[in-house]
Amino acid sequence: ASLRFGKMPRIQRTQATLVVAPMSLLSQWRTELERASLPGTLSVDLYYGDVREQLAHKLSHGNTDVIITSYGTLTAEYKQHEKRGSSVLFSGTWHRVILDEAHTIKNRSTIAARAACRLQADRRWALTGTPIQNRLTDLYSLLRFLRVEPWGDVRFFNSFLAKPFASQNAKVLDIV
């Protein structure tokens, strides 16, 4: 009930890592993390659906090392946070946020991209084999998420990279 009424615990700062991945990869992430660590040394939890409230309390007490969630859950939590200011994922600062299949946020105007960029973290990783799928601007959201300045500023990115690239500027073509 507290999930619906905005009474989730607030996390100021955590040493936990948040992994955001497509739903189809959540179990694989958990399996790989557990396989790569000694038994009992790493607490890994999936954060989606009905278990979110239980895991929110566990996280608020520092009883988990890695939370794995989907882009769908991230966007749902972001919407909730925007409406009520109540969301575990957005209530504090993570030690590390990892986006798997990070090209998922390629369109900066999508809720998933805005949500990913809004997460607070000491460290940020973006994992993708295709940082540019269709347009050079696909790269912008990744740079913004990673907080690579000044490239994470859309005006700077467009002025010094996207527009010169579109006009076939030789120097920019060499950079890209």
Language-model features: where?
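Conserved P-loop NTPase motor "coupling/switch" region that bridges the ATPase
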Residues: R96, T104, A113-V176
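SF2 helicase/translocase NTPase motor core
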Residues: A1-L99, K106-N107, L161-S167
